[in-house]
């Protein structure tokens, strides 16, 4: 074991040369009655692994070279090199050494020592949210919009469990997140102590990795490993659970021990093989109707993707997570595909003879009936995570690699003089012309009814007023889909939304996190009345920090997406989807009154009910300094179209109708 450990340390050191190298041992609890075990951890694909199995499953969950930038180093405070300090102060200095500048938090008894230590940091800015779910979504918005890991701190028990939705969201959307939780003192673990929950057990399947620290000397290494794991390979959330007595214990930190991740690092994919890239170029040359299908795995490859499209002329469609990775107003953009994607994007994939899938999961909201998806096409799948290759759709060519490196390699091949003749054969003009006709035949549009405000129109006006430059966060529901269709996205990390988990309440805290990460940027939360209410308390944080977050609520007084399904598939039978005041009997009362609520938080707000009022109201919102809320009252009968029913195929696509019709 000693020899193996020494070898592991050597294998890790080169890969981690640019990272701080703390040390120590970590112990993890398996269950309440089992003895402590050294260095146990769990990952995306494990439940109760042994130590040996753990190192393997970590690597399968998160592989390849880093897809997010290594965090910029923050200046580290000057300290006496041998000075003893509390474990909590060691945690904070470890965060500083990992480049952390912002922490989103909500304090409690088991995490008090960490919060006290944070007040002593000259480097880290602390952002107090009003709910732990809000703080974790804010950390997610920070990470999604910047590429740097977001950090959140919560107490034990309900504080830790309130993080769970956000951890699951980050896990599904591959967002680099480090969550630090307080825990009951070690002697009380397993005794059902006050606010004790086994958060490590809770989060085994929704984190990339997690730790329970049982030795104060482990803190520097574990924090370092947490950031390395969160931001390399396929990014994801990492949880670090720290008992209160560990936070209080005095120790001299050691910053020079290597990380203990030999299994993970040894399985990081190498650069893509040249022969596989040659095969892809050959398939492109043989194709007549190719399509690029781009996901969130391309968020660090925007330039390379645009260059590849320049060289090949292949049309591009994106997933919900891929929005912004290719400019949506580019002539070769087909915008989003899938359940609520454009007709022409879905038509293109249905008729393609070659599908280049880059950084995607082939999830059900895109594929529908998976056997019918891209059934005429040869499929090339490039992804950083080997577990995704062939999981939902079997490719003809699979490449486990960082998409950025794969695109760089293919671009170099296409640019070589020897490939000039081949490039002349890449003439897809007839295919592009066919798709242009579909764009004209099936544009993204909407109907108007007098002075009622179409929600799509409100988003179009916002797009025009902001010139498509805003960072847009959303909740989940109809407004989310309309925001994909009617706003222009030209760059990666401009679009922030809960895609895989579909968590309502995401928009406002995520927008707050994005505003923290991008000072001076225009940040707008396009939200629904139902989704906003789930984390409306974060208006307090936005106001107190005077963040210039604009909130545009598309308020239809209903749970709109569920109402749409009720209209289409349940004979319009309403089952608890009306969110207004039942006593109003549809008498025009807007409930709750978001304008009054915003005023209670000290945030200026306005409401519009007529189409002719929208532009002036949006202009006023965007011109206002600091936060602002605009309540846009829209009809609940609107449907998000196009729509492919769940488990449907392109032939089942719906392009007309709304709640004013019967089905």
From Swiss-Prot:
Gene Ontology terms: cellular component: acetolactate synthase complex; chloroplast
Protein name (database record): Probable acetolactate synthase 2, chloroplastic
Binding site for FAD: 234, 340-361, 383-402
Misc note: Acetolactate synthase is the target enzyme for sulfonylurea and imidazolinone herbicides.
Cofactor stoichiometry and binding remark: Binds 1 Mg(2+) ion per subunit. Binds 1 thiamine pyrophosphate per subunit.
Biased composition (Low complexity): 1-26
Family: Belongs to the TPP enzyme family.
Pathways involved: Amino-acid biosynthesis; L-isoleucine biosynthesis; L-isoleucine from 2-oxobutanoate: step 1/4; Amino-acid biosynthesis; L-valine biosynthesis; L-valine from pyruvate: step 1/4
Subcellular location: Plastid, Chloroplast
Protein's organism: Oryza sativa subsp. japonica
Cofactor(s), by name: Mg(2+); thiamine diphosphate
Region feature (Thiamine pyrophosphate binding): 478-558
Residues where Mg(2+) binds: 529, 556
């Amino acid at each position: 074991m000693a020899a193996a450990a020494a070898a592991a340390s050597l294998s890790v050191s080169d890969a981690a040369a640019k990272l701080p190298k703390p040390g120590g041992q970590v112990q993890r609890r398996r269950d309440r009655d089992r003895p402590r075990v050294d260095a146990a951890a769990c990952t995306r694909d494990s439940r109760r692994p042994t130590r040996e199995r753990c190192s393997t499953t970590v690597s399968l969950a998160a592989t390849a070279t880093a897809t997010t930038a290594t965090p910029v180093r923050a200046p580290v405070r000057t300290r006496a090199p041998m000075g003893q300090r509390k474990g909590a102060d060691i945690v904070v200095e470890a965060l500083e050494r990992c480049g952390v500048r912002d922490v989103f938090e909500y304090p409690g008894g088991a995490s008090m020592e960490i919060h006290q230590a944070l007040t002593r940091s000259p480097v880290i800015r602390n952002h107090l949210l009003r709910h732990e779910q809000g703080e974790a979504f804010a950390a997610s918005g920070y990470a999604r919009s910047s590429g740097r890991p977001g950090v959140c701190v919560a107490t034990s028990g309900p504080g830790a469990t309130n993080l769970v939705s956000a951890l699951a969201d980050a896990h599904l959307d591959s967002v680099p997140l480090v969550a630090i939780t307080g825990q009951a003192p070690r002697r009380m673990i397993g005794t059902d102590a006050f606010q004790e929950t086994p958060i490590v057990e809770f989060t085994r399947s929704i984190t990339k990795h997690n730790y329970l620290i049982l030795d104060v000397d482990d803190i520097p290494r574990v924090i370092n490993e947490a950031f390395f794991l969160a931001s390399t390979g396929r990014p994801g959330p990492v949880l670090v659970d720290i008992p209160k007595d560990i936070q209080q214990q005095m120790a001299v930190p050691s910053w020079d021990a290597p990380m203990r991740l030999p299994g993970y690092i040894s399985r990081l994919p190498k650069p893509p093989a040249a022969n596989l890239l040659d095969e892809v170029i050959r398939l492109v040359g043989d194709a007549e109707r190719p399509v690029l299908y781009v996901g969130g795995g391309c968020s660090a490859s925007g330039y390379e993707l645009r260059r590849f499209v320049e060289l090949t002329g292949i049309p591009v469609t994106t997933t919900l997570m891929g929005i912004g990775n290719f400019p949506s107003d580019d002539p070769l953009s087909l915008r989003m595909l899938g359940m609520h994607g454009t007709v022409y994007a879905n038509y293109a994939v249905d008729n393609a003879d070659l599908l280049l899938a880059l950084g995607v999961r082939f999830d059900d909201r895109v594929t529908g009936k998976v056997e019918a998806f891209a059934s005429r096409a040869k499929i090339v799948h490039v992804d950083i995570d080997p577990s995704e290759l062939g999981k939902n759709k079997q490719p003809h060519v699979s490449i486990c690699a960082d998409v950025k490196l794969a695109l760089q390699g293919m671009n170099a091949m296409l640019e070589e003089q020897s490939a000039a003749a081949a490039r002349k054969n890449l003439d897809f003009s007839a295919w592009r012309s066919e798709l242009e006709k579909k764009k004209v035949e099936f544009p993204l549009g909407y109907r108007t009814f007098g002075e009622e405000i179409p929600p799509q129109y409100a988003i179009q006006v916002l797009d025009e007023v902001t010139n498509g430059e805003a960072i847009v966060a959303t909740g989940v529901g109809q407004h989310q889909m309309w925001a994909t269709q009617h706003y222009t996205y030209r760059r990666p990390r401009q679009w922030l939304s809960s895609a895989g988990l579909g968590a309502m309440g995401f928009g406002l805290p995520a927008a707050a996190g994005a505003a923290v990460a991008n000072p001076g940027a225009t940040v707008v939360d396009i939200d629904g009345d139902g989704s906003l209410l789930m984390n409306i308390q974060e208006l307090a944080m936005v106001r107190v920090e005077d963040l210039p977050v604009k909130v545009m609520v598309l308020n239809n007084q209903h749970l709109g997406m569920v109402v749409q399904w009720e209209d289409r598939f349940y004979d319009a039978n309403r089952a608890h989807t009306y969110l207004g005041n039942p006593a109003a009997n549809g008498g025009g009362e807007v409930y709750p009154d978001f304008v009054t609520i915003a005023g209670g938080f000290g945030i200026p707000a306005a409401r519009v009910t007529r189409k002719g009022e929208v532009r002036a109201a949006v202009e006023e919102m965007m011109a206002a300094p600091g936060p602002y809320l605009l309540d846009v009252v829209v009809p609940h009968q609107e449907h998000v179209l196009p729509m492919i029913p769940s488990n449907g195929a392109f032939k089942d696509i719906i392009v007309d109708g709304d709640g004013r019709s019967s089905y």
